[in-house]
Amino acid sequence: MLVTGSAKRIGAAIVRAAHHAGYRVIIHALSSQSEAYRLADTLNQTRPDSAAVLIADLAVIEDSDALQGFVQDALSPFGQIDVLVHNASRFYPTAMGTITHSAWNELMLTNAKAPLLLSQALLPYLQAVHGCIISVLDIHADDRPFVGYSVYNMAKSAHRTMVQSLALELAPTVRVNGIAPGVNVLPDPHSDQAISNAQQAAIVNSIPMQRIGTPDDIADCVLYLARASYITGEVIAVDGGRSLTLAGGHMSV
């Protein structure tokens, strides 16, 4: 199983759960290299030669030779990939009047373009083992956009459409599904997106399950979809029911 952006947080939870379930895992990272190697070392101590690290910028998709190098590096540790999990993402506001070409390119590349072109590059290997593609999306990638995050919303919506388009195109050989987290990881309390205790309480109050989700909740769904041989083209909300009560709005709500 190859999980992009998997050195920390949700990605690392997916890797740990998959490894515990018996998968050999490839931990992809770029800036979080030390965390990636620490995670791999921990997993390999439990089961030798079962975890590998792939350090790469997803911008490799912009160059065909670099992309092929990424594919070969991904195949090198274990010789095959049967599950591709698109977890890497960039998330920050782009209010009207502040949108730049750089922000557009970065958010679109990470959240939409890279998943499509990586899927295409790895497709022959996934087809050979009747594998699957699983994308980590967002409950706001449908019809409940974040206010002030228009480029992110557009990119995740494109990614969601990719899931459903590829599910049709690649069936019956490769299954393609998505997972839409709600609030499963809170912003870093030291970041400019940090929320107050009152804001956190308001979020919990808006969730029918009355708790913030966890990365493990997402990991559990990834493992389910990896095994669910008759499910394709689905996007499962893992949000404690939040999307049922949400009509879009500001991050602070």
Q: Residue spans of the language-model regions?
A:
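Conserved glycine-rich cofactor-binding loop
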Residues: 7-8
